[in-house]
Amino acid sequence: MIDRVKILVGLLALIANGGNSFAQPDTDGGGSLTRLEGGGYVDEDTVRTARETLSHSVTLPEWKNPSAFEKDVFTFTRIIFWADPAKQVERGGFGGGGFGGGFGFGRRGWVVDYPDADLNFSHRLQQLTSMKVDPDARVMKLTNPDLFDFPFIYMEHIERMTLRPAEVLALQKYLKAGGVLLVNDFWGALAWKNLRDEISKVLPGRTWTELTMEHPIFHSVFNLQGPMSRLRVPSMQRWNTDYNPNDPNSNPTASYRGEGYETMHVQALLDDKQRIMVLAIHNSDISDGWEREGEYMDYFKLFSEARSYPLGINIIFYLMTH
């Protein structure tokens, strides 16, 4: 059984520092190689941590946990998966436009926002809560034998994700043992269909539950207020700079993301005890708020500080304690 609770002793001691809590930091081909958004490559077969991958956004502080806590820490763990280039994606989606093409990029959606999102979010968890957090974050395949050491795993841009039989079996065992998967940053009807189809191989017979703003996940640490559209985060490259957060009819996303992209949804697959096994944030990109926090102050204030970090912290707290 994966133990979620032992790494969260004292999590509720959230550091209260008013409006300055999220102070913005200073900015400064094929095979197993995959090209990163910011340039450079990562080897899927040998990479172990996000920290070892070249960061392109900000310079992050490093920290060390007390030796007694080195293993009992929360580790943000990103999953490497295969993206089938033959799968249809929405026009303008990842691989269908924008980031299409290139050496190993556009085929493997797992690298989007990596490694900056992973490292920034880990830093904010360490900074803003009393949680002990792994400063390096992990990245691995579902077939990695270390998978069961980490109660939380993360995927994004799953439009073309295709799980192989060994991955299906590993993920099924992981989720049934108490692990939880967060899926984020996928847009439109085709992307949703692909997630539904792939996860149905893992958890056949389970049906998705739509979470409303009344769900405690939205109030576990930060008391987030609805409607759901107030939590929506656009990708920075697609941000509508005329967006008015006080106007419920104002769309933060400036460009078409495929049929069915207009509304943010948060959906979950539950086990027989109503524990969340898979949480999916559809038509929103909270990880861009983590990745891009040091690049543009207006985006940081509107989305990183007000939405991405509060929602992310709420999600981790709730998933690790329920």
PLM feature spans:
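Short alpha-beta junction capping motif
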Residues: 76, 147, 152-192
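Extracytoplasmic/secreted envelope proteins and their assembly/folding machinery
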Residues: 118-122, 168, 172, 192-196, ...
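Bacterial N-terminal signal peptides
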Residues: 6-18
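Active-site-proximal beta-strand/loop segments in catalytic clefts of secreted hydrolases
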Residues: 79-82, 155-158, 184-187, 211-214, ...
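Aromatic-Pro/Gly-enriched surface loop or interdomain linker
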Residues: 23-152, 158-159, 285-288, 292-322
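N-terminal secretory signal peptides that target proteins for export/translocation
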Residues: 1-4
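An acidic, glycine-rich "communication" segment
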Residues: 29-41, 51, 55, 191-291, ...
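Surface-exposed patches in mature extracellular/periplasmic domains of secreted proteins
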Residues: 131-141, 183-186, 206-214
